[in-house]
Amino acid sequence: GRLTAAAAAKYGLKCIIVTVDDYDGELSGNLLLDGLFGARVIVKKNDGRDKDTQLTETVKRVMEQELQKGERIYFIPMGGSDVTGMLGYYDCAKELDAQAQEHQINGATVYTAVGSMGTYLGLYCGLKAIHSSLKLTGIAIMPLDKDKLHHYFLQAKEAYGFTFDDSDMHIETGYIRKGYNEPDKQVRHAICMMARHEGLLLDPCYTGKMFAGVLDMIKEKKIKLGSQLILLHTGGMPGLYTPAHRVKFEKELADTVTVIE
């Protein structure tokens, strides 16, 4: 939502972000940035039902209210995951393939986090469309709905006339941990490892969990030593400052600060 809010601010558009969650009144992480960009954030209290159902109902209600005010609406689904949103990573796949060829990284496997599936599907279709030698593996960071993914692919196939099928999609589902945006100690370790060895910041929800999954796959010998890997960084750094994540990092990193007189 925050990047949508930023784009809306740049082009003078009104932005409303709808989410289902528990809100403690603290603006931090993405919520703080949403506010800075001038977006209106509507938080639906989680009533225990399926979150997708609650979100759909709330979005419908908010849109009806805005239409009654005379507003014109352009709806963007969670993660921008529709046949338009996936085009960003469709183009990314072509750019990535060109860079791989330039650096003679042929036949490498690209790893990406998989949430609302737009990133994965865009990459998959882009690589398939240009007959890239790069392979693609997704690391699910939340329960994967395979039927939904297949339906999403069929929508894209119809919209853009793809001639290939989705029979060789590969998404690992064994590294979800506790669920969406619920990293464990192994994920935090993976984030620290990347930061301390490469100076790159991963996030607790997507890229950190993806990298932790890759490390587990290496330990389990699903990935052989010497294999060529490309880890796709999809952003998300503000998530490090979400209270629930920050507090755990602070406890684990407390000994990195020394006070002297």
Where do the language-model regions lie?
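Active-site-proximal loop->helix
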Residues: 2-46, 146-156
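Structural motif
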Residues: 74, 109-110, 228
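Small/polar-residue-rich loop-to-helix segments that shape phosphate-bearing ligand pockets
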Residues: 20-103, 170-190
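Glycine-rich phosphate/pyrophosphate-binding loop at beta-loop-alpha junctions
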Residues: 86-173, 232-261
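Active-site-adjacent helical/loop segments in soluble small-molecule enzymes
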Residues: 167-226
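Short glycine/serine/threonine-rich phosphate/pyrophosphate-binding segments
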Residues: 1-5, 10, 27, 116-123, ...
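Alpha-helix C-terminal capping segments
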Residues: 2-14, 124-130, 213-222
